[in-house]
Amino acid sequence: MEPIGFTFVAFVMSHIVSVFRKAHFNAAHRLHVPEWSAEENRAFFGLCNNEHFHGHNYDLEVKVTGQVDPVSGYLIDMKLLQQYINEEVVEPFDHKNLNMDTDDFRQLNPTAENIVWVIWKRLRSRIPAEMDLSVRLYETPRNFVEYNG
């Protein structure tokens, strides 16, 4: 007698999930508006306008939200997300002077608000369009910004 065979079919309902990846980089910058006088820049930006620049140990949180693939069980391969963050953020910005060493900030004041927006744009080009992207950047443990597109 032959065993009775059957096929197991799993029904997995697609669901929305957010995945997060953290990264870290160090960079220097100077906050400065060329159209303002030296006094106006110092008054507005304070120590962040230091002509010799200053640095931060940035912490980055990247959030990707979308439907989980019912076959793989993944929203996005975390190894790929790590690769995108390394290629688009860490490699171009780590241990760099953002004002002088990057094209992104040659004409754009590297405030935390502008840095998070640039990072979001760089990563958005790598993340599938059907997924939502949010980027949070910590300039200090108490000061952080977030951009969602």
Region locations from a protein language model:
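Intrinsic disorder/low-complexity segments
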Residues: 1-12
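Charge-rich, low-complexity N-terminal segments
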Residues: 12-149
